[in-house]
């Protein structure tokens, strides 16, 4: 539910929902991930980093958790850390079916739209789950003609 609230740009509600979820199960990695996303969109970067790190701590590394952590690093200007995670994910992308979109997310945070679109198009060719494109983190690409074309090809609203 918190994920849907974030997509709707209802970040305060997403924080509340995530906190309720984590009250029921403090070790629920997805709850920490969703709380991290909401915090990031509220520009509460330190809290977002803590939540993504907690998600990684309780469940191990995953492309989703690692890429969201790298996205926050990128937004904060911690480019070396973000790029290191991106390169690690790039090296493993053949074993991870959603890696392309996760890598693209990092490049969005870095402000590199060309690399973001390169990875999103690779994801499209690999038949990735396009729901990630609804996330607010991809808002900086919404005016890009290539991104609009990708959404059209997928059948998502532009």
Residue ranges and their predicted role:
Residues 1-158:
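Alpha-helical protein-protein interaction modules
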């Amino acid at each position: 539910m918190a994920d849907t609230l974030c997509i709707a740009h209802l970040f305060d509600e997403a924080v509340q929902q995530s906190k309720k979820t984590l009250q029921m199960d403090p070790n629920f990695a997805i709850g920490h991930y969703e709380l991290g996303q909401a915090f990031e969109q509220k520009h509460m970067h330190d809290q977002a980093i803590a939540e993504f790190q907690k998600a990684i701590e309780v469940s191990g590394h995953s492309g989703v958790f690692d890429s969201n952590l790298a996205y926050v690093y990128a937004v904060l200007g911690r480019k070396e850390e973000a790029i290191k995670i991106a390169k690690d994910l790039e090296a493993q992308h053949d074993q991870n079916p959603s890696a392309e979109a996760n890598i693209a997310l990092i490049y969005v945070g870095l402000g590199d739209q060309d690399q973001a679109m390169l990875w999103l198009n690779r994801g499209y060719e690999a038949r990735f789950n396009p729901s990630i494109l609804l996330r607010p983190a991809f808002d900086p690409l919404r005016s890009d003609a290539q991104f609009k074309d990708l959404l059209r090809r997928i059948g998502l609203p532009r």
